[in-house]
Amino acid sequence: MATTNCLLALAIAGLVLVSLPGLSRGDVDARRGRELAGGCNPSGTLRPSRSHSCQDCCKAGRSYPTYACSPATTGSTKAVMTLNDFEAGGDGGDPSECDGKFHKNTERVVALSTGWYANGRRCNKNIRINANGRSVLAKVVDECDSLHGCDKEHAYQPPCRPNVVDASQAVWDALRITGEDVGEYDITWSDA
């Protein structure tokens, strides 16, 4: 009886892994992007032909979803805040789209996923970010490109997920998010 139950459990686990291949690959980022995409479906995929040496860089042969949209905005839009280095030589890649400049990480600045960036309509405008029981204003200076990536312009990083507010260290500091929580953090945001 115990052997039958064990075999049944293994069969069910195998069925789940076959039905949901992302689970067997440990594809956490892809699952998280789908979970928070809010009706925004991938518009395509990028499959780089070569890998790069940084930890977060694209890997050859791996597929990365691209998005032309972001979830609809509300008075309290759910998003994932990520950490970005807006300075020259940082992981942000090229200068900011809105003003063609690099920014100090002591400035409260953000890049928004392609759909929220809205072809630059939010450039140089403030958004309000709420997290960790705090609220902060940050200026939109760049696009976190959800359509392109894995190239020099994008610091060899994958395309942005459709639900990202990519924030400078100053934003994280103002929200008093520190230690192991820095990197990715669930937030809400709105136009200010």
Swiss-Prot record:
Cysteines engaged in disulfide bonds, as pairs: none
Database matches in InterPro entries: Kiwellin-like, RlpA-like_sf
GO annotation, cellular component aspect: extracellular region
Subcellular location: Secreted
Major location category of this protein: secreted
Keyword flag Transcription regulation: no
Pfam families documented for this protein: KWL1
Official protein name in the record: Putative ripening-related protein 2
